[in-house]
Amino acid sequence: MKTYNRLISLHQKGDLKNALKLAELLIEKNPEIAKIHNFLGLINSSLYKNEESLKNFSKATEIKKNYAEAHNNKGVLLNQMGRFKEASEEFNKAITIRPYYAAAYKGQGDNLIDLGKYEEGIQNYSKALDLKPDFTDAKIKLIESLTFFNSKKQKSNSFVSTNNLLQNLKLDYDLNKKIRDEEVIDFFQKSNEILFKNIKNHEEIEFDNRQLFRRGNLDLNCERHKTIFENFNTIAKYCFGCFKVQIDPKNIIDLIKLFLVFDRLKLPNSKNIKKCLIEMRPDISGSYKGLVYCFSLKEAEEVKIILTEILTKVISKTIKIKIRRGCTEFGEAYPKYEEVDKKEEDLMKYNEKWLVNEKLMDERLPKRKTSKERVILGTNSGISLNDILVIHNWLIYAKKIGDLSYKKIVKNDQEILSSPNMDMDMSLQLSERVSYFSSN
């Protein structure tokens, strides 16, 4: 038992190399103990050894016929690999063995969402929360899914019913005249009233998302590109065609105004993703940002013209708008990459020698995001529960960095939901973030 606990500890610490050695040693000594095969599957999955991991989970269920946890773990891995039908079968096996297994319902929910079956996915998330009310991951997944789909069958779930009420909220603003501060205040107060009235124990939601998106049915697969950069310090080929129009709101009120604009803004290319965020990356300057993702420098220049005309009219004549290329981290590693003040043909080009790194990583990474079976929906317009919870995190941020405009939005600080993770993350860089805001 001590050796097995040490194995768990090594895995939790991220010491996968030694965890793998210990797991293989334990299996050599105890080949018929199912839980060791199951744990070896988790380790191999963390090491991107997906086929080995599948064999481990299968061996665990072969040894122990009614091993719900191993079936669930196999389902999670198959989902990540884009093998959705097989994943569904494994989750069903786990649920048949253990009907009150919340994690399996959550996993099945994830799988159904990937297949575009949102109503069924939400039903599974709701079941997971019925079984385990403090299941944070299931709460987050359910709330996120409501950004894309309005459930009609799960009205007994307080998250669903609250989201439906928020979606019916009529906001009186348009993009032809200035959005007044009072309209932002009214929007938040009405949304907050719905939130506090309809969700019991709302202080226990623990929702840590900090970005708001409006997008069509496109996934930029940024996680893949960042993984390539983190592992090889090279930029993915896709990112050489990625340009962003960046907007820098001066305070929390202007950030919310920008979000309201993005919610209604229709650009010529429906695939342009729009995002509002608070800056939380260490050593990255700025406080509040809006981004519109474009697919060429020419398109970014055209979008900048559109945004300048609208935002100087509805938010501020002095709002800052500029064009950036790719992720900030890429430009720090390769300064020429972020240069955009020249003709597109003169910009930094992709180094074809880097392609070997991409192919190597693509062989290791799960295929879920590139599966042809995966269905991607665009976000709903109007206000969602996800939106208002993210804005609560924005207000925490504003308060901590000294942006006193947040006091216009809330009558008192008790109207802002607490977030222990936000508090922790901010404590690690508070002086830095205060400095960035005060120098803006």
Please identify what each model-predicted range represents:
Residues 5-12, 35-46, 69-80, 103-113, ...:
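Conserved alpha-helical positions within TPR/SEL1-like repeat arrays
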Residues 251-252, 294-301:
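Helix N-cap motif at beta-to-alpha junctions
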Residues 107, 114, 134-259, 270, ...:
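Charge-rich, low-complexity segments
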